[in-house]
């Protein structure tokens, strides 16, 4: 549940796009998790930009909180596999769909590797009713602090 996720993460209520983890996953690239994401209309603070009277909200192809959900899911994956709190510091490529409409949203994050500077690499995908609508390849998460074994979320099935 989201209360379990955000008990471990420092994100305030306006930055909590994840509803809960639904599965531990493994593919040819690595292990990770799949989580449910709030519908666009239900993501906290959908209007992130301050606009004056009469100004229009900027048009966006993808809601910023969907990208944030990729970051948070990769962070949860690193907490579980590597025992670290981490923050996003870069990505090799981000691919967005032309339009992201309503439907059931999930995010998958698979840890694909690590580097000598204690960063981890992830591939993350947002799916709408099972079809990919946003993909981040080579998401790099930088380790910020080590966790005690008791602080790991225990979301990913052991090998």
Regions found by a protein language model. Name each.
Residues 1-159:
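A conserved, well-ordered hydrophobic junction motif at loop->secondary-structure transitions
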């Amino acid at each position: 549940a989201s209360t379990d996720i955000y008990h471990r993460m420092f994100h305030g209520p306006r930055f909590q796009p994840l509803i809960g983890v639904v599965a531990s996953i493994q593919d040819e690239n690595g292990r990770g998790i799949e989580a449910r994401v709030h519908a666009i209309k239900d993501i906290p603070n959908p209007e992130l930009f301050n606009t004056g009277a009469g100004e229009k909200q900027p048009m966006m192809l993808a809601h910023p909180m969907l990208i944030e959900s990729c970051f948070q899911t990769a962070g949860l994956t690193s907490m579980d596999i590597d025992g670290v709190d981490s923050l996003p510091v870069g990505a090799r490529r981000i691919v967005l769909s032309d339009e992201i409409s309503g439907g059931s949203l999930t995010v998958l994050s698979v840890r694909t590797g690590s580097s000598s500077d204690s960063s981890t690499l992830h591939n993350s995908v947002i799916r709408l009713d099972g079809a990919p609508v946003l993909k981040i390849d080579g998401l790099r998460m930088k380790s910020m602090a080590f966790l005690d074994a008791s602080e790991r979320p225990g979301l990913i099935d052991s090998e």
